[in-house]
Amino acid sequence: MTGSVDRPDQNRGERSMKSPGLDLVRRTLDEARAAARARGQDAGRGRVASVASGRVAGRRRSWSGPGPDIRDPQPLGKAARELAKKRGWSVRVAEGMVLGQWSAVVGHQIAEHARPTALNDGVLSVIAESTAWATQLRIMQAQLLAKIAAAVGNDVVRSLKITGPAAPSWRKGPRHIAGRGPRDTYG
């Protein structure tokens, strides 16, 4: 090791411009480069050399070639289906598809007169706009289940609960108990 660190009295004017910390860093870097060259590694000037030469250090880029490759762009729908399958979301996606794409699943004519409200445990609740449409949907329930199974898969919807328009009621919720019965309202 050479330099002005061993002999502080030499080159005082030059040392005043350079700090001893920078000199120590430069010596350490030079020693690391020399050790890298001794191991047979590239001991360039770091990022400055790679930017100046125009290529990034490391493995060269290889092109995929003319055939299909895993790195080729994939359709978004296919990627989403594969992600749902890997994560176990397929059933939930199919349930959402029944509710979200109702008109595409059952047809526009039925979708104009009936709408799904909930899908719980394989039971799809559907509200028809009139009692006539509710009756018609109950008659064609098997065909509706077949259409839904063809669109989203088997065992997503196992049965339908079809109701007509709601009449005025003071009951809240699907279950209830009998009230107090008729009362004397004429005080």
UniProtKB/Swiss-Prot annotation:
UniProt lineage: Bacteria, Bacillati, Actinomycetota, Actinomycetes, Mycobacteriales
Compositionally biased tracts (Basic and acidic residues): 1-17, 24-45
Region Disordered, residue ranges: 1-75, 168-187
Family designation: Belongs to the UPF0232 family.
Domain of life of the native organism: Bacteria
Source organism of this protein record: Mycobacterium tuberculosis (strain ATCC 25177 / H37Ra)
Signal peptide range in chain numbering: none
Protein name from the UniProt record: UPF0232 protein MRA_0004
